[in-house]
Curated annotation (Swiss-Prot):
The gene is Grk1. Residues 456-521 form the AGC-kinase C-terminal domain. One of its GO terms (biological process) is post-embryonic retina morphogenesis in camera-type eye. Inhibited by RCVRN, which prevents the interaction between GRK1 and RHO. Inhibition is calcium-dependent. ATP binds at residues 196-204, 219. The active site is at 317 (proton acceptor). Interacts (via N-terminus) with RCVRN (via C-terminus); the interaction is Ca(2+)-dependent. Interacts (when prenylated) with PDE6D; this promotes release from membranes. May form a complex composed of RHO, GRK1 and RCVRN in a Ca(2+)-dependent manner; RCVRN prevents the interaction between GRK1 and RHO. Residues 58-175 form the RGS domain. This is Rhodopsin kinase GRK1.
Amino acid sequence: MDFGSLETVVANSAFIAARGSFDGSSTPSSRDKKYLAKLRLPPLSKCEGLRDNLSLEFESLCSEQPIGKRLFQQFLKTDERHVPALELWKDIEDYDTADDDLRPQKAQAILAEYLDPQGTLFCNFLDQGMVTRVKEGPTGSQDGLFQPLLQATMEHLSQAPFQEYLESLYFLRFLQWKWLEAQPIGEDWFLDFRVLGKGGFGEVSACQMKATGKMYACKKLNKKRLKKKKGYQGAIVEKRILTKVHSRFIVSLAYAFETKTDLCLVMTIMNGGDVRYHIYNVDEDNPGFSEPRAIYYTAQIISGLEHLHQRRIVYRDLKPENVLLDNDGNIRISDLGLAVELKEGQNKTKGYAGTPGFMAPELLRGEEYDFSVDYFALGVTLYEMIAARGPFRARGEKVENKELKQRIISEPVKYPEKFSQASKDFCEQLLEKDPEKRLGFRDGTCDALRANVLFKDISWRQLEAGMLIPPFIPDSRTVYAKNIQDVGAFSTVKGVVFDKADTEFFQEFASGNCSIPWQEEMIETGLFGDLNVWRADGQMPDDMKGITTEEAAPTAKSGMCLIS
């Protein structure tokens, strides 16, 4: 009997069972009651100091933070003066993500309901000059049609309505959630499943948050290996960038904590495996992707790169292995340990970083470079998705790094027949040796890439709203990862002793919950709805007074309601 294969089968079965529904969400039965009981809103007496330490910026509190946005909208709904602005806000967001064939009808409804003085929800706070321009402008399905109205609405809400919110019970409820969000968390909150892969400093395994049942991927960075290989800088850079960037095309960081041996990053689990695995391992007799599938992934990578570059972050390690598929078949880019953040006023950086075969000529020559190196790597990635080999070596060819460097710097790329003229031309523009001529990030956007004929069938608005159906949907019964025995194990690191500076670094790294992903988890798994209990008479809820559900039970006739 092959015990290695048996171990993989058992581990895969446990992992798939824990996943439950393949979307990675949880059900009440998958929650650990002991840890679920710890997720309880505190009495207000514990939240008194939070208001003074909290940034009271409108956009952060009421738009960016998911729980903050929900509570602010719930507050607006309780006051008829604010309902028109609330409903206009929601309807514009609905219009922005609607299918093209539904947009004209939704646009007409917005004009009639909110901009007409006879409308049921007429918004009298809007500047009439702006209203006239919107009414007289084009109508239909174009993007940004109501952007001026949305900006004006948010400006209106950030004034008196926001100040009223700050004095309301709904803001006190937000403080309760912020207190809960700030509570310490460690490895005991997570249940580990099978190893999914291995990086330079440790393993990546599937894990489950015990209180909510939500599945994640846990990247474990061995402390001794980090110190021995001088990996502290890369680890903290990756954590800082993941904390800062929130994009559907980049993995999200939900938790950061330490154990005795590891620094742990708990991130979005991508159950579909990595693109390299799909290129070579899913159909070994027919490696590579059809062109439409490769184009779809390329479009999503472009959106992810744009989000990084708009935040002045050079990725430096784009390759199929770092592009992961989620449950639905959409991709996110991962592994930002080699990324570098350009300072304000700094346009370029320098340094040897990346994976052989994916590094741009200017980087290999030791020159300064900018975001353009990532678009060269995108060209290599697109080429490999279609051809099932890199552009600078034949499949299975062993090439010394010195020879590979020379090919990248000076040799032209040859394209097999699998490439259409459009995909070849696009690849050529990405693999341009001269970074000044290379297609890429210009004037703060990737619009020049989006306009390429290769993407004529892609609706970028729907792509970025997560509305398109991917060309490949992973099988819920399959684990898209190497067998456990093929992942390999790390050797023991000896002779490493930690000092005070190391301990301080570990403590800084282990910052606990990350606000936006944590709030999203509370909403997605139903915990927000379960705990967001209000009295029907509008008075202060019992949990704010420190009265438990059991203690409040005898007076339940006074009426309670749930709002999620």
